[in-house]
């Protein structure tokens, strides 16, 4: 199958339904991000165990792989994940996708891929929107510059949550990305060190969505069921994270506003490396019951 290309993307074209192999992948996914929350392994408030809401992000990338693999080194710039209902592990999720946009900006070519998800009963689970940039020689430079521009701002924030700390070993990176089209053909910058070095990195690079999983786990501990229903995670990737680094997820309440019978809470959330540099930052919002 030929790689995805900017010229061949047809904005608005619909794809799907495509079935994500949840039952086959969930154990490796949870292992990759070290998520031991009991709702994902034992009974949950919905009965059977459920998947982390953030899994819709990785499912969207595999859906994209089924259309055409992204060229190695494609930049994962932004990701939004909206949840409407919990995804039970005993049910089959199906995605419906489309290329929502493509454009040229700052000398690079970008595209936006949107997916909507239901389970086998027709229950709407949520949606995922990923923004990516095709490779260019300026990729690493731009990522570093964006990270430096956010560094001081993130340092000034005081995290108010119970942080999630994770060491990104190669074993974890492989477990997370081993089923990608590029990994299966030996071209993944997340799995194969040779591919990462060819792309200009010292070693393998963590998939940016791993930060989303850490933040989602943190929000699950904070909000419980309310993080699985009517919630949204919006994140930007600010700088690459290499194998061997340690990340810390944290956040703080930014706004709480009444919305009918419930309250909409907005949290500033981020992941930092050991130097205190932000690698991922954005917002998490959820509708919660009043205190």
Q: Where are the language model's segments positioned?
A:
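Hot-dog-fold acyl-thioester-processing enzymes
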Residues: 1-78, 139-229
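HotDog/MaoC-like acyl-thioester-processing domains
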Residues: 2-14, 78, 83-165, 237, ...
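A conserved acidic, glycine/proline-rich C-terminal tail/linker
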Residues: 230-234
């Amino acid at each position: 199958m030929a790689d995805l290309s900017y010229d061949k993307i047809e904005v608005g074209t619909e794809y799907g339904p495509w079935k994500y192999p949840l039952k086959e992948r969930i154990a490796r996914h949870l292992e990759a991000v070290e998520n031991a929350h009991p709702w994902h392994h034992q009974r949950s408030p919905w009965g059977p165990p459920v998947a982390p809401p953030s899994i819709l992000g990785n499912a969207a990338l595999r859906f994209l792989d089924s259309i055409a693999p992204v060229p190695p080194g494609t930049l994962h710039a932004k990701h939004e994940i909206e949840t409407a209902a919990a995804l039970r592990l005993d049910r089959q999720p199906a995605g419906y996708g489309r290329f929502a946009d493509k454009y040229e900006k700052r000398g690079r070519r970008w595209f936006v891929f949107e997916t909507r998800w239901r389970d086998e009963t027709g229950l709407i689970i949520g949606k995922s929107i990923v923004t990516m940039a095709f490779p260019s020689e300026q990729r690493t430079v731009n990522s570093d510059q964006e990270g430096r521009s956010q560094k001081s701002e993130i340092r000034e924030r005081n995290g108010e949550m119970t942080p999630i700390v994770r060491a990104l070993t190669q074993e974890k990176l492989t477990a997370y990305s081993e089923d990608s089209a590029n990994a299966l053909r030996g071209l993944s910058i997340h799995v194969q060190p040779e591919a990462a070095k060819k792309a200009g990195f010292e070693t393998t690079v963590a998939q940016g969505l791993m930060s989303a999983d850490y933040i989602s786990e943190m929000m699950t501990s904070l909000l419980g069921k309310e993080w699985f229903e009517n919630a949204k995670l919006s994140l930007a990737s600010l700088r690459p994270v290499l194998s061997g680094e340690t990340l810390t997820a944290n956040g703080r309440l930014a706004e709480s506003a009444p919305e009918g019978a419930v309250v909409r809470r907005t949290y500033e959330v981020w992941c930092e490396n050991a130097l205190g540099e932000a690698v991922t930052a954005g917002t998490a919002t959820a509708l919660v019951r009043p205190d």
